[in-house]
């Protein structure tokens, strides 16, 4: 049985979708950044069967549900310059690779426990020429600043990693003073917020509007005592 091939889509079509989507999000991209994002979509499609990166195979839907979805958090993080960012459970590199492309002033680290996915992330670092991107394999709760990663992080993000309370428990030791944890969620996670561990609280909740996607999305910022 042969694998189902992804439908072919003209790059110009994807580029126009990206132009329209970033305009709706009020994100200005250089030509180089736009090409990096389009190259990333192409590479996701090319290597998906090998690395099992995503169930989405249509390039248009990859652009919407992966790239624009990841970009939707950028306007809410605009004031954070020269940040150290950890993307937990990054998988195919989302949202971390997208953040590294559009914010070259950030140092972004991708984390996953699956070596095969870390290998893909490392390949993307080389192919997309992302000098501000690094990759670390292993369980986030076992990562130690100064050993596995250079230091603690200003922002720890996840897109599809775990229950919010579990995410906070596992990653809180990596939050730098003044930093916070950011979780991308679908429907508002009231039950998960109610289970947040002691010493953590929601600082703000933002409703995300993802262009061309009719689905509920939220961004939750959590602060922890250790980071204050």
Curated annotation (Swiss-Prot):
Q: Which of the seven top EC classes does this enzyme belong to?
A: transferase
Which molecular-function annotation in GO is an example for this chain? rRNA (guanine-N7-)-methyltransferase activity
Q: What does this protein do?
A: Specifically methylates the N7 position of guanine in position 527 of 16S rRNA.
Instruction: Print the organism lineage.
Output: Bacteria, Pseudomonadati, Pseudomonadota, Betaproteobacteria, Burkholderiales
Q: Which gene encodes it?
A: rsmG
Listed GO cellular component terms? cytosol
Does Acetylation appear among the keywords?
no
Which Enzyme Commission number(s) are listed? 2.1.1.170
Q: Which family does it belong to?
A: Belongs to the methyltransferase superfamily. RNA methyltransferase RsmG family.
Residues annotated for S-adenosyl-L-methionine binding in this entry: 89, 94, 140-141, 159
The residues forming the signal peptide are none
Name it: Ribosomal RNA small subunit methyltransferase G
Q: Which UniProt keywords apply?
A: Cytoplasm, Methyltransferase, rRNA processing, S-adenosyl-L-methionine, Transferase
**Species of origin:** Burkholderia ambifaria (strain ATCC BAA-244 / DSM 16087 / CCUG 44356 / LMG 19182 / AMMD) (Burkholderia cepacia (strain AMMD))
Instruction: Classify the source by domain of life.
Output: Bacteria
Q: Where in the cell is it found?
A: Cytoplasm
What catalytic activity is recorded?
Answer: guanosine(527) in 16S rRNA + S-adenosyl-L-methionine = N(7)-methylguanosine(527) in 16S rRNA + S-adenosyl-L-homocysteine
Presence of the UniProt keyword Cytoplasm in the record: yes
């Amino acid at each position: 049985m042969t694998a189902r091939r992804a439908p072919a889509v003209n790059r110009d079509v994807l580029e126009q979708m990206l132009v329209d989507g970033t305009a709706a999000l009020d994100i200005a991209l250089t030509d180089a950044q736009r090409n990096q994002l389009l190259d990333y979509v192409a590479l996701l499609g090319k290597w998906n069967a090998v690395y099992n990166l995503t169930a989405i195979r249509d390039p248009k839907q990859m652009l919407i549900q992966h790239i624009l979805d990841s970009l939707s958090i950028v306007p809410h993080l605009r004031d954070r310059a020269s940040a150290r960012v950890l993307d937990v459970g990054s998988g195919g590199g989302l949202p971390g690779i997208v953040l590294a492309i559009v914010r070259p002033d950030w140092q972004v680290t991708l984390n996953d426990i699956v070596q095969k996915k870390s290998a893909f992330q490392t390949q993307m670092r080389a192919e997309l020429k992302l000098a501000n991107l690094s990759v670390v394999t292993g369980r986030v709760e076992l990562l130690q600043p100064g050993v596995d990663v250079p230091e603690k992080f200003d922002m720890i993000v996840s897109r599809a990693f775990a229950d919010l309370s579990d995410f906070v428990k596992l990653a809180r030791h990596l939050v730098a003073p003044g930093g916070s944890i950011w979780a991308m969620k679908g429907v508002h996670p009231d039950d998960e917020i109610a289970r947040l561990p002691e010493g953590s609280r929601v600082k703000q909740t933002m409703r995300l509007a993802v262009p061309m996607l009719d689905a509920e999305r939220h961004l939750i910022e959590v602060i922890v005592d250790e980071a204050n």
